[in-house]
């Protein structure tokens, strides 16, 4: 039944979205493959942060450049995503490390199921928790970066003689409006 629903979804996406819908499905498949590869690399003992950085870059490239083409807007969005994710990576790692997140919570650790778990893993659960949080935020960051860079690009096209500080203020206002709209 799930396969049938998935096929119906794909058909509807292609019928409604046309070429863009097909490109979105291909990008989704590429992102799923990238995440699957990252999980496999985590499992075989590859460095979690390097795999996370590589997966983040690859997912960003697939989402931005494959779906939207290579132009000044997508390169600006990619740079914004890279900078934002580096800052978020450090902040998320600090919060996860200080809070002791990762692994089993108190309820799971007290349950009987824990007796059947293999506790001899060579994987740092706080690092995996950081990787999961970072990769989970990536889609929202990409969406916001592309929205703001496209809007600022349009402002610059319609007002070519706008001063840089006004353009930055415009971008900040657009970003605030977009965050407010997205979280209401």
Question: Where do the protein language model's features map onto the residues?
Answer:
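Conserved small/polar residues in nucleotide/adenosyl-binding loops
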Residues: 182-184
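Membrane-anchoring/interfacial helices and their immediately flanking loops
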Residues: 1-34
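Short helical (or helix-break) motifs at transmembrane helix termini and adjacent helical loops
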Residues: 139-155
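Helix-loop junctions and hydrophobic alpha-helical segments within the transmembrane domains
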Residues: 164-176
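Hydrophobic alpha-helical transmembrane segments
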Residues: 121-140
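Juxtamembrane helix-boundary/capping and inter-helix hinge elements in multi-pass membrane proteins
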Residues: 71, 155-165
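Selective transmembrane-helix segments that form parts of the transport pathway or gating/packing helices
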Residues: 82, 174-180
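Transmembrane alpha-helical segments that form the functional core of multipass membrane systems
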Residues: 23-106
